[in-house]
C-alpha cells in the first residue's frame, strides 16, 4: 500500500524524534554536506556547511524577509539570519519544534531576527508577495501535495525572488521497491519525486529553474553517524534509526539535490 502521511503524521513523527535527530546532527534537523565524502569532518562542520550552501543560493540582501519552509528547531534560520542580515520566519508542523526553537533562540526572536510558527506549507497563512525569498531543507519530501505547497510558496514570494531547496529525490527507476517502501514508512515520506519531476513541478507552479545539482555522494557520510547513534540505543528507536541509516546507505537510487529556482 502506498503511504500518504498527512501533515499531522509528519508533525507527530518529528515530535517523537526531534531530540534524537538534533543530537546526531549537531542541533540541525538535516544532513550535512561533505565537500570530500572521504574526509573525517564532523557532523557539525558538515551541517553548518549545508545551511551555508542553501543560504548563499538565496542571493539575499540585508533587511529582506525570508521564509524557512520546515524550520525544525530553528538553528538554520539563526545561522542564515546572522550571515546575511535578513529576517526569517520559520514554519513547521511540529509543535514541539516550535517550543524548542523559541526556547533555544529566544534572544534572536526578541531581536526580531527570526520568528517561528506552526504552519503547513500547503496552506500558508501569509499575504501574497510578502517574502523576498524562501528555502526548504528536507521538507518538501514529506509533503503529500507538493504542487499545492509550491503554489503556496510561489504565491507568497515576490517576483524575481529565489527558492533554494536541499532535498531527497529518487532516480526514475528503483529496482528495490520493498526497501524504498520501508524507508517511506520509517521517515513518513509519501512517494518521492524524481529530480526531473521536481524541476517540472517548479516550472508549472511559477518558477524558473536556475540550478539542479545532484549531491548524493556528498551527503551519504551522514549514514555512518546515524548508524553509530543507532547502535548506542536500545529498543525500537535504535532499530528504526539503524534501518534509516541502512536504507540511505544502500539505496543507490536515492538522490539528494540542491535546486535553485526563481519566482517568475
Curated annotation (Swiss-Prot):
Keywords: Methyltransferase, S-adenosyl-L-methionine, Transferase. It catalyses: desmethylrestrictinol + S-adenosyl-L-methionine = restrictinol + S-adenosyl-L-homocysteine + H(+). Its EC number is 2.1.1.-. Gene3D superfamilies: Vaccinia Virus protein VP39 (3.40.50.150). CDD domains: AdoMet_MTases. One of its GO terms (molecular function) is S-adenosylmethionine-dependent methyltransferase activity. O-methyltransferase; part of the gene cluster that mediates the biosynthesis of the tetrahydropyranyl antifungal agent restricticin that acts as an inhibitor of CYP51 and blocks the ergosterol biosynthesis. Within the pathway, resE uses S-adenosylmethionine to methylate position C4 of desmethylrestrictinol to produce restrictinol. The highly reducing polyketide synthase resH, the short chain dehydrogenase resG, the cyclase resF, the FAD-dependent monooxygenase resA and the enoylreductase resD are required to generate the first stable intermediate desmethylrestrictinol. Belongs to the methyltransferase superfamily. PANTHER family: GERANYL DIPHOSPHATE 2-C-METHYLTRANSFERASE (PTHR44068:SF11), ZGC:194242 (PTHR44068). This is O-methyltransferase resE. The lineage of its organism: Eukaryota, Fungi, Dikarya, Ascomycota, Pezizomycotina.
Amino acid at each position: 500500500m502506498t503511504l500518504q502521511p498527512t501533515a499531522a503524521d509528519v508533525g507527530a513523527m518529528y515530535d517523537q524524534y526531534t531530540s534524537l535527530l538534533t543530537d546526531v546532527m549537531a542541533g540541525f534537523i538535516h544532513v550535512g554536506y561533505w565537500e570530500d565524502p572521504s574526509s573525517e569532518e564532523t557532523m557539525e562542520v558538515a551541517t553548518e556547511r549545508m545551511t551555508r550552501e542553501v543560504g548563499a543560493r538565496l542571493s539575499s540582501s540585508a533587511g529582506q524577509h525570508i521564509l524557512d519552509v520546515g524550520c525544525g528547531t530553528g538553528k538554520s534560520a539563526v545561522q542564515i539570519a546572522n550571515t546575511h542580515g535578513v529576517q526569517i520566519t520559520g514554519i513547521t508542523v511540529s509543535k514541539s519544534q516550535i517550543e524548542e526553537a523559541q526556547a533555544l533562540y529566544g534572544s534572536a526572536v526578541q531581536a526580531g531576527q527570526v520568528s517561528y510558527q506552526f504552519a503547513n506549507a500547503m496552506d500558508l497563512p501569509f499575504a501574497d508577495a510578502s517574502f523576498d525569498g524562501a528555502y526548504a531543507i528536507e521538507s518538501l519530501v514529506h509533503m503529500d501535495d507538493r504542487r499545492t505547497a509550491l503554489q503556496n510558496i510561489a504565491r507568497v514570494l515576490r517576483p524575481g525572488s529565489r527558492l533554494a531547496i536541499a532535498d531527497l529525490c529518487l532516480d526514475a527507476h528503483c529496482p528495490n521497491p520493498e526497501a524504498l517502501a520501508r524507508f517511506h514508512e520509517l521517515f513518513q515520506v509519501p512517494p518521492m519525486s524524481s529530480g526531473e519531476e521536481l524541476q517540472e513541478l517548479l516550472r508549472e507552479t511559477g518558477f524558473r529553474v536556475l540550478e539542479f545539482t545532484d549531491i548524493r555522494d556528498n551527503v551519504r557520510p551522514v549514514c555512518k553517524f546515524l548508524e553509530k547513534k543507532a547502535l548506542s540505543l536500545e529498543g525500537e528507536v535504535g532499530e528504526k534509526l539503524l534501518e534509516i541509516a541502512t536504507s540511505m546507505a544502500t539505496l543507490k537510487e536515492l538522490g539528494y539535490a540542491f535546486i535553485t529556482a526563481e519566482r517568475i
